[in-house]
């Protein structure tokens, strides 16, 4: 037996064992076969990863039966997405950590353009995939990341208020009764709390300004004992080092003693943009953070200690000092990005930059999940099917990550050595015009 065939056989055995563990998490024995088929189909080459093309690749001589089996398993079967993702995490995370510890928990969301108004969660909203307002649905995720890899461990559809209040559409798409309106930062905080409760080793939380602008999100992370490096908008106000709100007014002996911090016209915080532009040129340092496709990625940064001023006039104690990290590329007329970070006061500028910029790794996940595993290909309209399909995509992706982790950090394992029956030449997907 050749070395390559031996390696392929070992990989097949690992994949089979992994699928067995996922099937166990799906509970019912009759769900094992469609689960294994679905995950295998997601990893096979092919442009579309919706149910019918999967069925055609997996059972080209019995497409109808396979289609019914996969559709029931994904759209109707009441297995737990959380249990399956947890099983995938228990398998994949130790493999990822072979090449280094988890360095970040990454919060993000991704959009799926979708026509019509009947698919669960679809409204006109900002869609990152196309970079503008579009008819789409958006899901929030939490990923655990090492230096080389990351794995989504939580996933939930953002449900706009118009959907939450529409009883008829809720019924038609099977939205669970317990699902109420929650902002994207609130969904992310729920996901983070759950992973903290499961006693997963913690790491600083990374997120963009869509989450960092929410003060309740930042405060929620701190209450959980988690550090963060998260984007904020330039209008955010802060007190620079050495400055702070005025103390409470002196008590005059009547009524309750004043306890709230104060401001006045002469004593106001600065916006991040104002603060950045007030800094001397010597403040800005060149920092490179990783290799790009052609050269090292490099820009100018500065970091200073600040206190966030958000509603501090309702506080009786000074807010804690934290880092403000600012990026100002030399070719730009003003700073382009701002982050708040609760890392220790002795953290070096380079470490702050590298961690803030590590959020890029989730973009690679989404790209591969969408392009290679068909994350956005689910064609059903229901809540359960949308989440089940995403969970299976993530689980299949997890096995790819685990296999890559067996190689050196810079290596790529390539595609799995999976085989599927050849599709008969006479097969035509539903909706294909008949030949004349």
Task: Describe the function of each predicted region.
Residues 1-31, 42, 159, 173-180, ...:
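A short, flexible helix-boundary coil/loop motif
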Residues 2-206, 210-230, 234-237, 244, ...:
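Conserved, well-structured functional cores that handle cations and Mg-NTP chemistry
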Residues 101-102, 139, 321-322, 335-338:
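Short, surface-exposed beta-edge/turn micro-motifs
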Residues 107, 111, 211, 258-269, ...:
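Short amphipathic alpha-helical "interface-anchor" segments enriched in bulky aromatics
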Residues 111-112, 330-331, 344-346:
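Short, glycine-/Ser/Thr-/acidic-enriched flexible segments
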Residues 138, 361, 365, 388-394:
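Catalytic-loop motifs flanking and including active-site residues across diverse enzymes
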Residues 325-341, 358-373:
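A glycine-rich, aromatic-flanked flexible loop/lid motif
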